[in-house]
Amino acid sequence: MHFTIQREALLKPLQLVAGVVERRQTLPVLSNVLLVVQGQQLSLTGTDLEVELVGRVQLEEPAEPGEITVPARKLMDICKSLPNDALIDIKVDEQKLLLKAGRSRFTLSTLPANDFPTVEEGPGSLTCNLEQSKLRRLIERTSFAMAQQDVRYYLNGMLLEVSRNTLRAVSTDGHRLALCSMTAPIEQEDRHQVIVPRKGILELARLLTDPEGMVSIVLGQHHIRATTGEFTFTSKLVDGKFPDYERVLPKGGDKLVVGDRQALREAFSRTAILSNEKYRGIRLQLAAGQLKIQANNPEQEEAEEEISVDYEGSSLEIGFNVSYLLDVLGVMTTEQVRLILSDSNSSALLQEAGNDDSSYVVMPMRL
């Protein structure tokens, strides 16, 4: 194997792929990146056995084909530290990788390409082409509500549900739920659900950087695959049953509050400073045309904010974890937001005013 490549051309796919590679690995080969030269294309592959990412780059010069694995982190650090306009020459000689650039020379240890595990590919049952920017928005609007290390392992991921002309993302940690839908060219009538693990979905969002570009998504029995011109991303799916999210969406709330998103966000942020550091509880008191927000903590410190809102219902007092409310307001983009409530023991439904492709549910807190 022997090829030359500009530093920039190598660094971009290398940084993408190195993001998947975990530093602490039980198998030494999993800390490595697989380099494969075929014709005038170099592909780089990283995996942690759950997520696999292949980055592709065209070589300008004719190259000698071959395949080898080298430590991902070290190769990336070397490339980062070279001058921007460096031309890198890489060849394999007697189980070592020799890298030359200008007056710099590096020799890296290698492991054979045969040792590198591949994610098993099953048949794909459903394929669709989506705009990268729309899929990224879908993920970013819902990923914050995923659980982190819940024993209910199916919550440590995101539900992707396809039905005719619609792709929907749902995530929940049992205390709050986020849901966002987009139109998608899907012919299939039946609903099809998959759960993508947390690391996989966050990694996928990181890859969708081309505002004009498309991405092809394949949903299989045990895998999801996303392909663009520059990369192929594969993730195993979580084997489990996601909760019936439609049962969680509050129905029939009769108290509608409309307020300025930024003003609410700032008021919640200020009040949060004096909320209980562990439970983060704040109290909302609604009356006609106004919302009072209160917090206190074990040190008997108190914060209170008053904010004007559009509200005409009866008065109501309800408690929430302020972090959950701030997370929701943080992903919304409209000037006005809707808050739909029914009573102090029922969940709140939050939506952007004038846009119902996203819905957020937050359970109340007893204060």
Residue ranges with predicted function:
Residues 1-367:
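Structural preference for solvent-exposed beta-strand-turn elements
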